[in-house]
Amino acid sequence: MSSDELVYMNWREIIMPEKVAVTTTSTYGKFVCEPLEKGYGITIGNSLRRIILSSLYGAAIVSVKFSEALHEYSVVSDVREDVSEIIMNLKEVKLKLDDPGDKILTINVKGEKFVTAADIISGDGRVEILNPEQHIATVSKGGELMMTMLVKTGKGYALAASNKDPEAPVGTIPIDSVFSPIKRVKYVVGASRIGQKTDYDKLTMEIWTDGSVTPEDSVAYAAKILKEQMNPFINFDEDIEPELVEKEHEGAAKNFNENLYRSVDELELSVRSSNCLKNAQILKIYQLVQKTDNEMLKTKNFGRKSLNEIKEVLTSMDLSLGMDLEGFEPPEEDQIKEGE
């Protein structure tokens, strides 16, 4: 083995995740990644979580100007809420922009009305209100509420002081802004199995967003950011690395579905099907999946109904009948029984 080959082993011999199982809606996502090397679950999970929470861009209202109020301690005639309460409500309005850049929003309400985010008017129509039901103010009969809001893009959380524009018109009130489109992120690290070894990591991440970005995209963007931040630490030319030649190493471990090691009792089959398997000495799922349809139908008292039942359950576990398990190693206790 050359010294170069020894260097390449540092990353070529690392266990890579087989896939990322994804369950998502427009605002919630669950991501299960396995198998990972021991310790990588925390390393990757914590890194992605911090980036998702701190580094993704979003849009928020950064200032507001009322027609008859000059500061946040003012009141607006015939409006139940004072200016500070209205500002608190504006901070809860969730926005999505079609393109970057500053946007102007307005509210022009006259007469008795329960004002919500649905009453916000976008001048160019390129701002989407994600929570139109958000309460803003309550205008009494004969009153009016007229105000102009400035929307900017940013990331994280910005205090009103940082949103203050010295060139803004008199009466413009800067407000605190929550730019992050992420509501919550959590991750859990569990155990994953490869063959007989169970000391690998399984990373499960859950993400809640405000709807301006999908959970899937938020993970993808965070992974891209992390990748770009790591690139400067690579001090060699990756393009000159030779192509990996696939070799069949004697005794090399293959990644097998962990359900293969479970008892057939865990399939929760009908009594008839369970008894047929026991009579045929099929006690573990790995023994079952190596049987073909025809072999199963030759089993005493085993019919087409039982066959379909078993095939349906196996499909839900990403398994099937007639599987080739070359290289599979049964649990030690099963090998001992077979040798007796």
Swiss-Prot record:
Keyword entries, A-Z: DNA-directed RNA polymerase, Nucleotidyltransferase, Transcription, Transferase
Domain of life where this protein originates: Bacteria
GO cellular component: cytoplasm; DNA-directed RNA polymerase complex
Species: Desulforapulum autotrophicum (strain ATCC 43914 / DSM 3382 / VKM B-1955 / HRM2)
Molecular function as annotated in GO: DNA binding; DNA-directed RNA polymerase activity; protein dimerization activity
Lineage of producing organism: Bacteria, Pseudomonadati, Thermodesulfobacteriota, Desulfobacteria, Desulfobacterales
Gene3D superfamilies registered for this protein in UniProt: 5' to 3' exonuclease, C-terminal subdomain, DNA-directed RNA polymerase, insert domain, RNA polymerase, RBP11-like subunit
Function, in words: DNA-dependent RNA polymerase catalyzes the transcription of DNA into RNA using the four ribonucleoside triphosphates as substrates.
Entry EC number(s): 2.7.7.6
Domain description: The N-terminal domain is essential for RNAP assembly and basal transcription, whereas the C-terminal domain is involved in interaction with transcriptional regulators and with upstream promoter elements.
Region annotation (Alpha N-terminal domain (alpha-NTD)) ranges: 1-237
GO BP terms in the entry: DNA-templated transcription
Enzyme class: transferase
Family: Belongs to the RNA polymerase alpha chain family.
Oligomer status and interactors: Homodimer. The RNAP catalytic core consists of 2 alpha, 1 beta, 1 beta' and 1 omega subunit. When a sigma factor is associated with the core the holoenzyme is formed, which can initiate transcription.
Protein name: DNA-directed RNA polymerase subunit alpha
SUPFAM superfamilies assigned: C-terminal domain of RNA polymerase alpha subunit, Insert subdomain of RNA polymerase alpha subunit, RBP11-like subunits of RNA polymerase
Catalytic activity: RNA(n) + a ribonucleoside 5'-triphosphate = RNA(n+1) + diphosphate
Positions of the UniProt region annotated as Alpha C-terminal domain (alpha-CTD): 256-340
